Amino acid sequence: MSLYRDEGVVLRTSKLAEADRIITVLTRDHGKIRAVAKGVRRTKSRFGARLEPFMRVDLLIAEGRSLDTVSQAESIAAYGAAIVGDYAAYEAANVIVETIDKLVGTERERMTDQYRLLIGALNALAKRAHAPQAIGCSYVMRALALAGWTPRLGTCVVCGAAAPAYLSIASGGVMCEADHTTDARRIAPSALGQFDALVHGDWTVLDAAPVERVVRELVEDWGEYYLERPIRSLRLIDS
């Protein structure tokens, strides 16, 4: 049984048997993996608390046929401890881990940029760097942009005209009055500016005012369209 070492962020866990857990982790070098953490539900477990959601850990893993097994786990950053004490941050963290979990398959494909974006977002939540809602919404748009779904927001996707007044999720960006499709929704300049700031992580804009409801709805709809399934945690952050 071969061993490999990597660092990663725990996305979610599920119970297995009486004392074990299956953990889903986005790693730096091996993409998303699922591994068995044996005995972690026992009170005397060596590393149970290190393998909770939102924790960044250094792992030694034994490769298996269907599931790997965690042999060692050392904490790198305990984001979870800082996040769970703040409900708004906890909601945003759930949006973040649900998004990356649904975005990334388990093909062990290395995706360093996605990993860096993930730890950056969780670190910002833990440090209260910005409003949790803005961090969560910006993460969704930036993660999808890294996957190739960046909205075109400067000029009409049909004719290239400036001063667009509509946004079509299916068409991938903004549209002018003359060329907008039936699915396109009218968008005010202020909302378009916030949406663009979420895509590019422009915190000067995002720190100036709370994210508008219409913009949060755009993030939710954009995510559902391109992931082909809803990000359910976003519905809570928007309520």
Curated annotation (Swiss-Prot):
Q: What does this protein do?
A: Involved in DNA repair and RecF pathway recombination.
Keyword Ribosomal protein listed? no
Gene that encodes it: recO
UniProt KW DNA repair keyword: yes
Annotated coiled-coil positions are none
Alphabetic keyword roster = DNA damage, DNA recombination, DNA repair
Q: Which GO terms describe its biological process?
A: DNA recombination; double-strand break repair
Q: Which family does it belong to?
A: Belongs to the RecO family.
Query: Domain of life here?
Result: Bacteria
Q: What is this protein called?
A: DNA repair protein RecO
Cellular component terms per the entry's GO annotation: bacterial nucleoid
> By its UniProt entry, which Pfam families does this protein fall under?
RecO_C, RecO_N
Listed InterPro entries:
ARFGAP/RecO, DNA_rep/recomb_RecO_N, NA-bd_OB-fold, RecO, RecO_C
